[in-house]
C-alpha cells in the first residue's frame, strides 16, 4: 500500500519487520503516559494531516482512529520521533479514558514496582 507520508519522514523511521513503529500517547500539559499502540507509514501520515490519533491494529489489520467509536478522542498537538527512529511520541489532549477498558491510561491496572 502506498502512503502519503513525507518521504523525508519515512526515511527516518526504523520499522519492525511488519513495517510498524511504536507510538506512545502522552497527555499535553501533565506528561501523563496514556497508551502505546502501533503505526505504519499511513497511520502516521493520517495522524499528521488530521491531528487525530490514528493507529494500525495488528490483530484486525486495519486502521483505527482513537475515539471514533467510544468518543474518547485524541487531539494531537505534537508528534516527535525518538533518537532511534523506532518510536513516535504523540502529545495529545485526551477526552475521557485512553484505554479500551475505560481507564484513564493503559498503565493503571498492573503496578509491577512502586515506591515503598
Curated annotation (Swiss-Prot):
HAMAP family, A to Z: HisI
Xref: InterPro entries: PRA-CH, PRib_AMP_CycHydrolase_dom, PRib_AMP_CycHydrolase_sf
Reaction(s) catalysed by this chain's protein: 1-(5-phospho-beta-D-ribosyl)-5'-AMP + H2O = 1-(5-phospho-beta-D-ribosyl)-5-[(5-phospho-beta-D-ribosylamino)methylideneamino]imidazole-4-carboxamide
Note accompanying the cofactor annotation: Binds 1 Mg(2+) ion per subunit.
Positions with a binding annotation for Zn(2+): 83, 99, 106
Signal peptide: none
Species: Saccharopolyspora erythraea (strain ATCC 11635 / DSM 40517 / JCM 4748 / NBRC 13426 / NCIMB 8594 / NRRL 2338)
Pfam families, alphabetized: PRA-CH (PF01502)
Name of the protein in its database record: Phosphoribosyl-AMP cyclohydrolase
Keywords: Amino-acid biosynthesis, Cytoplasm, Histidine biosynthesis, Hydrolase, Magnesium, Metal-binding, Zinc
Gene (name only): hisI
Superkingdom as given in the UniProt entry: Bacteria
Subcellular location: Cytoplasm
NCBIfam families assigned: PRK00051.1
GO CC term, one of those recorded: cytoplasm
Cofactor needs: Mg(2+); Zn(2+)
Record's keyword annotation contains Zinc: yes
Family: Belongs to the PRA-CH family.
GO biological process: L-histidine biosynthetic process
EC number of the protein: 3.5.4.19
Pathway terms, separated by semicolons: Amino-acid biosynthesis; L-histidine biosynthesis; L-histidine from 5-phospho-alpha-D-ribose 1-diphosphate: step 3/9
